[in-house]
Amino acid sequence: MLDKLRSRIVHLGPSLLSVPVKLTPFALKRQVLEQVLSWQFRQALDDGELEFLEGRWLSIHVRDIDLQWFTSVVNGKLVVSQNAQADVSFSADASDLLMIAARKQDPDTLFFQRRLVIEGDTELGLYVKNLMDAIELEQMPKALRMMLLQLADFVEAGMKTAPETKQTSVGEPC
């Protein structure tokens, strides 16, 4: 029973999130995204490992919740924009991006399964994919890391069980 409920939440959750995501002003989304990205990539920024993004734009599209943003490095700082001309684009569903962030899925595997789509500048895409592959959970603030791992465990378990769907035939009320 709980497995079925978890599976339904995992499979229907993104569609439920899409409405609040659409209604949230981009200024608030930008603030949250810049804070989270800055936390996660602070060391990489300090070490110059994100110089490849200086003046170039990465588009990230979370398909199932219809969330898209563009990020770049400007004067050594990660910035998020609502609109930009993307040099490379990454798109995937929220659960797949969550699994990558939690180190439970490999970006290459998702790419070859066509669950992670990378388009645009090949070299820049490879740099970004390698950066995703090198995410160090230990660099995250503990509260964020724990939340990410618990959510990833929940989603992973929910993805293993297909949600139960009732079969209806023509003429039956839905």
Curated annotation (Swiss-Prot):
It comes from the Bacteria. InterPro entries: SCP2_sterol-bd_dom, SCP2_sterol-bd_dom_sf, UbiT. Keywords: Ubiquinone biosynthesis. The keyword Lipoprotein does not apply. One of its GO terms (cellular component) is cytosol. Pathway: Cofactor biosynthesis; ubiquinone biosynthesis. GO terms for biological process: ubiquinone biosynthetic process. Disruption phenotype: Deletion mutant is unable to synthesize ubiquinone under strict anaerobic conditions. Mutant shows normal levels of ubiquinone after aerobic growth. Residues 45-133 form the SCP2 domain. Required for O(2)-independent ubiquinone (coenzyme Q) biosynthesis. Likely functions as an accessory factor. PANTHER family: SCP2 STEROL-BINDING DOMAIN-CONTAINING PROTEIN 1 (PTHR10094:SF25), STEROL CARRIER PROTEIN 2 SCP-2 FAMILY PROTEIN (PTHR10094). HAMAP family: UbiT. Belongs to the UbiT family. This is Ubiquinone biosynthesis accessory factor UbiT. It comes from Escherichia coli (strain K12). The lineage of its organism: Bacteria, Pseudomonadati, Pseudomonadota, Gammaproteobacteria, Enterobacterales.
